């Protein structure tokens, strides 16, 4: 589609996926240095994180930390990290299993609709969602030591 450039970072077994030929896809193979990754994370207004499942969602939280508006699957735990106030949720069309976890397969039409909405988003709406993403990250990071302390105290009582 006629969308802005999509930067795709792949490593490991995913790096051998079939090459998609499109002028607006910048596909990066292999691991990036920390500086390269930080530069890309901060340069992109939107981060597309279409995970089938997540343990905690590190790359989603990294996206929120830079104030990116995240597009991710409307399933746990992704939708616990990204809400409508700080991102765009993509519906899933089926659920599978991988060992002891559920996998959520996003709807291609839903992802296209979310990208279309992101592209059409006003500067004010993006700025509000971006600020909400960054604020959530800062609050989560600042409250983490207290939550750990509380959990540890509860576990020894």
Question: What is each model feature region?
Answer:
Residues 94-127:
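C-terminal "capping" alpha-helix adjacent to the active site of nucleotide-linked donor transferases
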Residues 47-48, 71:
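A short hydrophobic beta-strand element within the catalytic core of glycosyltransferases
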Residues 120-153:
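A charged, aromatic-enriched C-terminal amphipathic alpha-helix characteristic of glycosyltransferases
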Residues 38, 61-65, 76-80:
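Short alpha-helical segment that forms part of, or immediately flanks, the ligand-binding pocket
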Residues 1-34, 103:
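Conserved catalytic-core segment of nucleotide-activated headgroup transferases in glycan assembly
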Residues 38-44:
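Short alpha-helical donor nucleotide-sugar binding micro-motif in glycosyltransferases
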Residues 69-72, 77-82, 88-89:
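Short hydrophobic beta-strand element within catalytic cores of glycosyltransferases
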Residues 52:
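Aromatic "clamp/platform" in nucleotide-sugar-dependent glycosyltransferases that forms part
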């Amino acid at each position: 589609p006629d969308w802005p450039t999509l930067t795709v970072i792949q490593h490991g077994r995913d790096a051998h996926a079939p090459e998609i030929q499109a002028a607006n896809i910048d596909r990066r193979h292999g691991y990036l240095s920390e500086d390269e990754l930080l530069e890309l994370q901060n340069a992109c207004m939107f981060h597309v994180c279409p995970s089938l499942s997540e343990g905690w969602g590190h790359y989603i939280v990294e996206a929120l930390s830079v104030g990116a508006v995240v597009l991710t699957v409307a399933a746990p735990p992704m939708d616990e990290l990204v809400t409508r106030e700080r991102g765009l949720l993509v519906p899933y069309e089926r659920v599978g299993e991988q060992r002891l976890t559920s996998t959520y397969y996003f709807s291609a039409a839903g992802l296209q609709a979310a990208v279309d909405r992101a592209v059409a988003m006003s500067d004010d709406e993006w700025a509000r969602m971006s600020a909400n993403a960054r604020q959530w990250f800062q609050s989560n990071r600042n409250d983490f030591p207290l939550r750990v302390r509380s959990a540890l105290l509860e576990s020894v009582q």
